[in-house]
Curated annotation (Swiss-Prot):
GO terms for biological process: DNA replication; viral genome replication. Belongs to the herpesviridae HEPA family. Residues 203-249 are annotated as: Disordered. This is DNA helicase/primase complex-associated protein. The keyword Nuclease does not apply.
Amino acid sequence: MALSPVRVTEGKPLGVYFYNVWREARLVIWYVSYTPSGQTEALDFVFVVQEVCDEKWSALPASAGEASAFESGIHTILWERELRGHNEWIAALEGRGGEVFVFEADAGRVLTGLRVKGEEEGVGGGGGGGGEGEYSPETLRNAYFFSQSRQEFSSGRGGDAGREEAGAPVSGKEKLWFRGMVEDVCVSDVDIVIRTARGVYSCPGGDGGEEGDGAEGGDGGVGGAGDGAGAGGGSSGKPPAGKRGRPTRLRITDLFRPVDCELAWRGRAVKLRPVLADFDVMWANPESAWNCCLPEFFRALLARTTRDFEGLPPALLYVFPAACREGSRFPPHFAGFPFFRVLFEPMRRVTADWLVAGDDRPPGGILLHHPPFYRSRLADRVLCPGLRGDEIVRRARAGGGNCWPLFATELNEGLCPEGRHDLLRVERAHALLTLDLARAACSMLGARVENPGEFLARVVETGSRDLLNAATSAYNLLLTGVLRWAAEAGFAWAAIDKSRVFLVSEAEPPSEDAEEIEESLWASLGDHPPPCVGLVSGYGRENASVFLLWKSDRVLVGKSSDLSCPERRCGSWRESLDAALSLTLTEAPDPAGILRELMPSYHAHRHETKFWLVDRAFAAGRPERAPPMPVDCLRPAPYLLIGEGAVCWHEALDLPLDVDFAAYLSETLSCVSAALAPPGGGGEAGEGRNNTDHCLEEFKSVLSLL
């Protein structure tokens, strides 16, 4: 059906969302939001509609099914997500993020034409990249969503019920406590605060709407009043502080505004009611990923904004990590309503470019745990929207025989002392060059991400075999090229730690300048990596350095240049192990003395949960405890070492009183001893060991003081 455009606007896309299905017309409707250029409005939108063929229509679920706190309409979400790949406009909007589009729409805001600004032909018929024109992207408008609730688990492993698992040793496959916890959860005492640049909306349960009118009339929204503490574990998260003075109190209608539109199609018409927010991005506190508040708030908001509406309402469809069998690295996903991105990380300024093309965790990434996306080309389309399937296959075959698996970890045994494969010490003055291949490998896959290591981990877990092979080939092409260059430049490789490569040279290096080293590397690598991607992450002269293979899957690195201020490496206890290794490079290293040097940092962070979190490898051999909340649905799940073993935890929860500081101190000492032990074993003499044990007890007492 030909549609005549009456609105022509330009802008950068913010997101594509599923609106609903118009069953009478067999039409799927998407909502596309964008930041318009050259206009006073901060946000604009259009609808993309598509008729569904018989084959696809027969696969549409009859209904969204019964909603839970962690999942609503997952089969409908998967169905519509698969349809996106067959729509050229949707594919362009999701795959060419950061470009300015020209939107042509009819009177009902239905898209009738789309092209990248600067291209002659519309999407689907043109090539080449679009120009920026006079568009100057500004920082998007933020909102912060803070929620608290009390959760009680009557039949799961939450709270004290988790103690029943305390005797199970950590071995084999990791336990997943959240499954039982979310089967029967009771939520109460809900408090919600939304802060924007205009003011603050608050919905403390049962307040009668004094602070805000609530998402559902005067009942305050969802839940009743209470202290907001989670059952079995307190929360350290707090809403961000605003400017001085009393902030403006907002009502829910100040934040969300329904807009009525009419869609005409083949002699039929239907009314639509999208809801426009007073912001572009919502940042939620981490607890909102498991405390059940966010879905209920949006459910009440949708009910309020569509009350007495006789048209086709938006669909509220979502999936949370707790709805995935193994949990997820990806955050919760709202496929449609409320039509903006919800991010579960510290709030910061972002642009439209970042939201569409720069975010490490693409919208809908959590769907990759479900068929038909899991390890399929559909998953690749979500992970790498800018890379075609045939291009992925070509790159998968480009590497030939791969010598290293993705994320290899090893030391150069040719440089290790006899009898040791886990320790490498360079005692003489040398140049140390540290390279990181992750960003270049991601760029070879067409992925522009902030955390390339995390992105590659998601490829390993959820990508297709072709995408995994393409990533492995890119990694091997880079690694073999780097090692070839190193041999020619007089460097020897000392260690490979996943994407990091450590090169040492006791001879005169080709240059003392890191930029010249980078240029020499690029010239050697040829056409493999794309331009403008840095490889050098560190370069300098060292009097000595040490590399230790620890827990079989990580390399700890100590450098003499870090001796002047070892605590600067201690952003976490895990990082303190590198600082401890640096301290073994002194003239007369003493284990107890090294521990004493680290104590100021340990003491300063003794109440900070995030500082003491470790991955599961550090909990090996200790009895495992369930978390007080279903936080293990967020993968990979970190742990705390406690008196009864190890407990799965989250940085948003307060540090428990039974943290086993002695276990952390002992692990630090073990690391130091391994770096100092001579080939063939041996250890401290009796007097030195007694002194170390005495210091261990003393330091444990200091850290345990409130």
